């Protein structure tokens, strides 16, 4: 946080991590000079409503950066907040299918702290948001890549087994998908 000159981050996380005390670990790690604000209502699939709520909290507390703490949903929400905190208009203006790729410029500083190992959102340039009308919105830009990712395997300990298994299946699915959809096919026997 200090390297990115973030003094007042918005931490986007979900109710599940809050309920098992994981957000307390973040509070314990942050120095006294940093005043985090927590948005702990990230849904299982981040929504336009959640982005707007988190963005309102970001602005009301004069935040200067974003931390995505949790699974892919929390990190995708953090990316959308980092984008909208530094851009005019609404999310739809920046959707890939609406020509928004080129409109995305520098976002607010962002750190990703994954607690699962499934989506890879901490090292990707994309974010998936469910709009209020049910459409899936894809945001994509190199500017959405987190400035830093803190990958600590100890953060995956203590998660419910079903979540760990689901994240593992997600990672496996990403690998299989890459094999079959890559523009340069590979021999699957190697």
Q: Residue locations for each model-derived region?
A:
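Electropositive phosphate-/nucleotide-binding environments in soluble metabolic enzymes
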Residues: 3, 20, 24, 48, ...
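Conserved beta-strand elements of the Class I
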Residues: 10, 65-67, 111
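Single conserved hydrophobic/aromatic residue that forms the stacking wall/gate
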Residues: 180-190
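Residues at the starts of beta-strands that form the adenosine-phosphate
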Residues: 8, 35, 109
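N-terminal, positively charged, Ser/Thr/Ala/Gly-biased leader segments
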Residues: 1-9
């Amino acid at each position: 946080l200090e390297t990115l000159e973030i003094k007042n981050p918005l931490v986007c996380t979900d109710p599940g991590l809050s309920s098992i005390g994981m957000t307390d670990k973040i509070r314990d790690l942050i120095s006294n000079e940093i005043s985090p604000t927590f948005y702990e209502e990230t849904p299982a699939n981040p929504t336009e409503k959640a982005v707007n709520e988190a963005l309102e909290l970001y602005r009301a507390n004069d935040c200067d950066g974003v931390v995505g703490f949790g699974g892919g949903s929390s990190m995708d929400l953090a990316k959308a907040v980092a984008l909208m905190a530094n851009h005019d208009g609404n999310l739809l203006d920046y959707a890939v299918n609406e020509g928004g790729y080129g409109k995305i410029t520098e976002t607010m500083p962002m750190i990703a702290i994954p607690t699962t190992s499934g989506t890879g959102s901490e090292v990707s340039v994309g974010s998936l948001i469910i709009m209020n009308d049910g459409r899936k919105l894809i945001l994509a830009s190199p500017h959405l890549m987190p400035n830093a990712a803190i990958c600590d395997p100890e953060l995956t300990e203590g998660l419910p087994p079903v979540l760990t298994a689901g994240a593992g299946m997600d990672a496996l699915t990403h690998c299989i998908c890459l094999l079959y959809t890559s523009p340069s096919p590979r021999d699957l026997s190697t």
